[in-house]
Design a protein with these regions (language model features):
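N-terminal leader/linker segments that precede catalytic domains of diphosphate-processing enzymes
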Residues: 1-161
């Protein structure tokens, strides 16, 4: 609805009514969030590392210490807590699983395929960064048994790491 009434008077936000005649307060009092299923939200971090001489490009992977995909390599990541932003969760998970902190990351992509996680409906927000890796040694922690840099190699047909 408009914030201006029919006689051109300003209507304060708290007094504005929707098509059912409800103010925002009345609407929220009767609102039932249980009408919608709740997906979980996770974050993953894609960390590229470059040597200072620019001759070596690597990607940081962790070895999962638990199901699903136990003993498989994956991007560092985990669940977003209800009280934190996705970026805060990304920073927390990166430090918990690799020991790395104070690394600036950019949001890259949101993955929302309904069956992408075997546990439940999960929406994942991926972050990415490129950092100099000379002298940076990740330390596995939390639910990661390893945290390692893998070389990225290019050939005519595929990218491998």
């Amino acid at each position: 609805m408009s914030e201006i009434s029919n006689n051109n008077e300003y209507i304060p936000r708290a007094e504005r009514r929707n098509k059912d005649g409800l103010t925002e307060k009345e609407f929220l009092e009767q609102y039932n969030p249980g009408h919608y299923e709740r997906p979980s939200v996770t974050v993953d971090m894609l960390l590229f590392g470059m040597s200072r001489d620019l001759k070596c490009l690597k990607v940081l992977l962790i070895k999962r210490n638990n199901h699903p995909y136990i003993d498989c390599y994956a991007l560092p990541g985990g669940f977003v807590n209800i009280t934190e932003s996705a970026y805060t969760a990304a920073c927390r998970e990166l430090e918990e699983e690799t020991g790395l902190k104070d690394i600036y990351m950019e949001q890259l992509y949101t993955m929302s395929q309904p069956d992408r996680d075997p546990r439940m409906r999960v929406i994942d927000i991926a972050y990415m960064t490129l950092i100099p890796i000379d002298g940076i040694k990740p330390q596995a922690g939390d639910d990661a048994s390893e945290a390692l840099w893998f070389d990225i190699t290019f050939n005519d047909e595929i990218l491998t790491f």
